[in-house]
């Protein structure tokens, strides 16, 4: 097959692993910067061009689209879909997952347990917003934040009010969430491929921090997950329409709670910790599901 990887940086670990895994299986792979793609949109002659050339048809596209380029990155992916390429995560699913409010609403409607969560833009009554999620301590997040950026633990009501007021001054959407103290700065990252959790790690925040993101200095070890956690991770990914997902779960006293579903999970930390060939499993999924011309038949 001919496969395109959409990424701004082909030197990243995840891209190199996917490239290597696909090449080992005999596929032809090209890494494309989605921001350098430009498109002709017309009923009879739609096409994609890249750095002065008309791109050929790709059997499959692997989107590795960063959060800051979601709009144009998914637009480029959508064009590939309309031209008949199979996407490893559809553009609509990526957009859905990147919208934190929308994704939480869909997960809640599906009956998936979440931390108590409130969202606001300019709350007239900060005290009521805080009370709505059970009071302090609580976590205040910028809806657009990623990798632990724009996330603050407010241990008292006064601190929570100050953080919310400060974030409100940024003209940003604010997400307020109960703090799961018993998690002790740990979470579980489940890597879902299709209808299977292929690997899972427990991430522990560094001393003095509650954010377990590996980008923030957290450490990881192999996680032994329960059948319930496995079911929740798969259901969360399927609820958002994702074939590939990193599902973050907190272990609370009342049971596992989904924190977030990542549509473009990094492979480095989880592959190096578990030794699982996740990139190979992703390519294998493409081989089993990339039906030629599927999106041409369905309209994308």
From Swiss-Prot:
Name assigned to this protein: Probable alpha-L-glutamate ligase
Chain residues that bind ATP: 141, 178-179, 187, 211-213
Chain sites annotated for binding Mn(2+) 1: 248, 260
Family note: Belongs to the RimK family.
Binding site for Mn(2+) 2: 260, 262
One Gene Ontology term from the biological process aspect of the record: SOS response
Keywords: ATP-binding, Ligase, Magnesium, Manganese, Metal-binding, Nucleotide-binding, Protein biosynthesis
Gene Ontology molecular functions: ATP binding; metal ion binding; ribosomal S6-glutamic acid ligase activity
């Amino acid at each position: 097959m001919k496969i395109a990887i959409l990424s701004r940086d082909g030197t990243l670990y995840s891209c190199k692993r996917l490239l290597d895994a696909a090449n080992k299986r005999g596929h032809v792979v090209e890494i494309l910067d989605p921001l350098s793609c430009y498109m002709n949109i017309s009923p009879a002659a739609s096409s994609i061009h890249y750095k002065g050339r008309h791109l050929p048809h790709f059997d499959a596209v692997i989107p590795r689209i960063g959060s800051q380029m979601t709009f144009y990155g998914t637009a480029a992916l959508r064009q590939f879909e309309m031209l008949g390429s199979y996407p490893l995560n559809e553009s609509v699913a990526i957009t859905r997952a990147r919208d934190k409010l929308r994704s939480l609403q869909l997960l809640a409607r599906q009956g998936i347990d979440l931390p108590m969560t409130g969202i606001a833009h300019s709350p007239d009554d900060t005290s009521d917003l805080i009370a709505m999620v059970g009071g302090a301590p609580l976590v205040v997040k910028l809806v657009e934040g990623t990798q632990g950026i724009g996330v603050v633990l407010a241990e008292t009501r006064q601190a929570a009010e100050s953080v919310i007021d400060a974030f409100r001054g940024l003209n940003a959407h604010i997400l307020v969430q109960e703090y799961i103290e018993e998690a002790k700065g740990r979470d579980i990252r489940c890597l879902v491929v299709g209808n299977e959790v292929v690997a899972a790690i427990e991430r522990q925040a560094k001393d003095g921090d509650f954010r377990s993101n590996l980008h923030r200095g957290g450490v990881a070890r192999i996680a032994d997950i329960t059948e319930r956690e496995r079911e929740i991770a798969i259901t969360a990914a399927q609820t958002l329409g994702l074939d590939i997902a990193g599902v973050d779960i907190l272990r609370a006293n009342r049971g596992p709670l989904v924190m977030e579903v990542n549509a473009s999970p990094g492979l480095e930390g989880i592959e190096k910790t578990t030794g699982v060939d996740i990139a190979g499993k992703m390519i294998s999924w493409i081989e089993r599901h990339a039906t030629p011309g599927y999106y041409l038949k369905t309209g994308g």
